[in-house]
Curated annotation (Swiss-Prot):
This is Large ribosomal subunit protein uL29. InterPro entries: Ribosomal_protein_uL29 (IPR050063), Ribosomal_uL29 (IPR001854), Ribosomal_uL29_sf (IPR036049). Belongs to the universal ribosomal protein uL29 family. Transmembrane segments: none annotated. It comes from Thermosipho melanesiensis (strain DSM 12029 / CIP 104789 / BI429).
Length: 66
Protein backbone atom coordinates (compact mmCIF):
# COMPACT_ATOMS: atom_id res chain seq x y z
CA UNK A 1 0.00 0.00 0.00
CA UNK A 2 1.07 3.54 -0.63
CA UNK A 3 1.46 6.01 2.21
CA UNK A 4 -1.15 8.32 0.66
CA UNK A 5 -3.72 5.51 0.79
CA UNK A 6 -2.83 4.75 4.40
CA UNK A 7 -3.18 8.40 5.46
CA UNK A 8 -6.85 8.31 4.42
CA UNK A 9 -7.56 5.58 7.00
CA UNK A 10 -8.53 6.19 10.62
CA UNK A 11 -6.24 5.24 13.50
CA UNK A 12 -8.44 2.25 14.34
CA UNK A 13 -8.30 1.00 10.75
CA UNK A 14 -4.53 1.44 10.74
CA UNK A 15 -4.18 -0.53 13.97
CA UNK A 16 -6.31 -3.36 12.54
CA UNK A 17 -4.27 -3.34 9.34
CA UNK A 18 -1.05 -3.37 11.38
CA UNK A 19 -2.14 -6.48 13.29
CA UNK A 20 -3.15 -8.15 10.02
CA UNK A 21 0.25 -7.37 8.44
CA UNK A 22 2.07 -8.71 11.51
CA UNK A 23 0.14 -12.00 11.26
CA UNK A 24 0.89 -12.14 7.54
CA UNK A 25 4.60 -11.60 8.21
CA UNK A 26 4.63 -14.36 10.80
CA UNK A 27 2.97 -16.76 8.35
CA UNK A 28 5.41 -15.79 5.59
CA UNK A 29 8.35 -16.46 7.90
CA UNK A 30 6.97 -19.90 8.79
CA UNK A 31 6.47 -20.70 5.10
CA UNK A 32 10.02 -19.57 4.38
CA UNK A 33 11.48 -21.83 7.06
CA UNK A 34 9.46 -24.78 5.80
CA UNK A 35 10.52 -24.10 2.21
CA UNK A 36 6.98 -23.41 1.03
CA UNK A 37 7.45 -19.74 0.15
CA UNK A 38 7.87 -19.10 -3.57
CA UNK A 39 8.10 -15.30 -3.60
CA UNK A 40 10.62 -14.23 -0.96
CA UNK A 41 10.08 -10.55 -1.77
CA UNK A 42 6.71 -10.75 0.01
CA UNK A 43 8.55 -10.73 3.33
CA UNK A 44 10.32 -7.43 2.65
CA UNK A 45 7.18 -5.87 1.13
CA UNK A 46 5.19 -6.77 4.23
CA UNK A 47 7.91 -5.39 6.53
CA UNK A 48 7.88 -2.12 4.59
CA UNK A 49 4.09 -1.92 4.83
CA UNK A 50 4.36 -2.37 8.61
CA UNK A 51 6.96 0.41 8.77
CA UNK A 52 4.73 2.74 6.73
CA UNK A 53 1.78 2.12 9.04
CA UNK A 54 3.87 2.68 12.17
CA UNK A 55 5.32 5.88 10.71
CA UNK A 56 1.89 7.32 9.96
CA UNK A 57 0.62 6.43 13.43
CA UNK A 58 3.67 8.10 15.00
CA UNK A 59 3.25 11.21 12.83
CA UNK A 60 -0.33 11.53 14.04
CA UNK A 61 0.77 11.04 17.64
CA UNK A 62 3.30 13.85 17.32
CA UNK A 63 0.95 16.07 15.33
CA UNK A 64 3.13 16.17 12.24
CA UNK A 65 1.24 17.06 9.06
CA UNK A 66 2.10 15.75 5.61
Amino acid sequence: MKAAELRNLTNEELMNLLEEKKRTLMNLRFQNVLGQLNDHSQISKTKKDIARIKTILRERELGVRR
